[in-house]
Amino acid sequence: MLKKKWMVGLLAGCLAAGGFSYNAFATENNENRQASSKTDALTEQEAEAIAKTVVDGTVEDIDRDLYNGKEVYEVEIEKEGEDYDVYVDIHTKQALNDPLKEKAEQVAITKEEAEEIALKQTGGTVTESKLDEDDGAYIYEMEIQTKQGTETEFEISAKDGRIIKQEIDD
């Protein structure tokens, strides 16, 4: 009987020691993994350099963001008067998109053609006009000062010339 109690005590002690050892190893391993992922993480400067290989222009802003469920740096680059967003994966250090290629595939009408479409709807003078990308779709945003003195804002699809929005301001 004394031998059984001694064995149960020894077994309980071994299990407790093993549990403590496993917990210490798991904590240390997790700390090492976190430290290595921090040293492997992409810096803003690296993200900027990678993004500029996709769109060569002036970097205006860099923010951490999510893109298609991945942690990225969103690098906003201005080139020839237009803004482009390049998404660089923080872990793989790869550019995930090519906005110049996307634009070429999606922009079928010129800014002048979009302005003509808007001017047919309301006469006047175009006071502001620019191509903008919104959630992967390219649109022309413009403002027209009418002959009656009101301002009309338009959003026109760059792919097919469809009027997406027309708003009259008093």
Swiss-Prot record:
Residues 1-26 form the signal peptide. Keywords: Signal. It comes from the Bacteria. It comes from Bacillus subtilis (strain 168). This is Uncharacterized protein YkoJ. Disruption phenotype: Cells lacking this gene show no noteworthy improvement of beta-toxoid secretion. Induction: Up-regulated under secretion stress conditions in a CssR/CssS-dependent manner. Overexpression of ykoJ is lethal to B.subtilis.
